[in-house]
Design a protein with these regions (language model features):
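...with weaker cross-activation on analogous glycine-rich loops/strands in unrelated enzymes
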Residues: 1-48, 55, 69-71
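Flexible glycine-rich active-site/ligand-binding loops centered on an Asp-His dyad
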Residues: 56-61
Length: 72
């Protein structure tokens, strides 16, 4: 069985995992945790974790959202 289920963008809740795709393909290259209403927690390569507003840069790259089955 799987520990995560895919959820719709419109059903996203705090701490859902956000998967981001590459600018040039549908390949998932980055992850973050969704924080309502428009923020995420993530770590960029070589950096430290931080909370950031979901700017157009990130919104355009959202691939999918996933929720741990115990958080539903």
């Amino acid at each position: 069985s799987t520990c995560f289920v895919k959820v719709k963008l419109t059903d996203a809740q705090n701490y859902d995992v956000m998967a981001f795709k590459s600018e040039k393909s549908n390949l998932i290259i980055h992850f973050g945790l969704f924080l309502k209403p428009t923020k995420m927690l993530h770590i960029e390569e070589g950096g430290v974790s931080h909370v950031e507003t979901l700017s157009d840069y990130w919104v355009k790259r959202i691939h999918s959202f996933y929720r741990h089955v115990n958080m539903g």
